[in-house]
Amino acid sequence: MTSHPSFTAARLRRWLLALACCSFAALAQAQALPAKFDATRDAAADVRTAVGLAKAQGKQVLVDVGGEWCIWCHILDKFIATHAPVKRLVDENFVVVKVNFSPQNRNEAVLSQWPKIKGYPHLFVLDAEGRLVHSQDTGELEAGKDYDEAKVIAFLEKHRRAK
């Protein structure tokens, strides 16, 4: 009888260790995605990582294409960070990956698989399998010198993963 409880304890320890390893792996992958546009990043690898995270987390992928040179890219980043309803929708429904477009790195191999971009930033929504769901010209989401919260929320709600 004493072997049965220790067997259960051993199984529990293995299960907890496996859970901890998975948690650390997911955290490491999430931290591996760029927080800003970086010409030195491997965009294809970043998109693959984002798709893997989206699949594991039941989310869509929001591919944000732009560059550090792009004023509207920074305006969009600030807009998302400072508008709680928008930030909540993004955080709860999307894995965000930034793909650089600049003279140093146009990331043509990655970007050529999706529709042409007219301006920056540009957003692509991918499903958890990496398939294109939507291509969004962010100019359509603007209002004056900022973004329109209602338009951004409508875009995010329309393209989040059905639950």
Residue ranges and their predicted role:
Residues 2-17:
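Bacterial N-terminal signal peptides that target proteins for export
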Residues 39-59:
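A short beta-strand-turn-helix
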